[in-house]
Amino acid sequence: MKVTPDTPGRDDPGPGRRIGLDVGTVRIGVAASDRDARLAMPVETVPRETGMKGPDRGDIDRLIDIITEYDAVEVVVGLPRDLQGNGSASVKQAREIAFRIRRRLTATGREIPVRLGDERLTTVVATQALRASGINERDGRKVIDQAAAVEILQTWLDGRATALNTLPETPHTDEKGNFPR
């Protein structure tokens, strides 16, 4: 079944930090952006406690604390898809965590958008980056989740910058991020 992630930049809440989440069955990787929403950085790995049924557990509490601590204006939860855009078995889990976060934020009077961002190949890219840095998969499982969250969020931030035409200007590019001729 085809699943479609949200589009970066659509109904954008404006400047401010974003939180990215890589939801797994055992852990949730967390990343945060800078205030300018240009660069994603790892934050922590939260042990997964909340299941598909039953009450929110400590993991949701911790995620809400992080969102509050970073004064986030948007949360991006990775939507697991294959290269053809079909949803994996983990789609329900990602949507469930997104729903629970949205519900808790709304209950506390905070209308922070919770989006579903494209997660294709993020764990693969994160694993390759860790291997290249000398960390093996077994030793780096918790770090892999954070690195995957960074990939999810950075992909979102880059898409947002393109959609809003706010690519950073460098000495080699003009104000729109284009290379001079």
Swiss-Prot record:
Principal subcellular localization: cytoplasm
Its EC number(s): 3.1.-.-
Start and end residues of each stretch annotated as Disordered: 1-20
Keyword Nuclease: yes
Keywords, in A-Z order: Cytoplasm, Hydrolase, Nuclease, Ribosome biogenesis
Biological process annotations from GO: rRNA 5'-end processing
One term of GO molecular function: nuclease activity
SMART domains assigned: YqgFc
Cited InterPro entries: RNaseH-like_sf (IPR012337), YqgF (IPR005227), YqgF/RNaseH-like_dom (IPR006641), YqgF/RNaseH-like_dom_sf (IPR037027)
GO CC, any one term: cytosol
Record localization: Cytoplasm
Family affiliation: Belongs to the YqgF nuclease family.
Protein's job: Could be a nuclease involved in processing of the 5'-end of pre-16S rRNA.
Name used for this protein in its record: Putative pre-16S rRNA nuclease
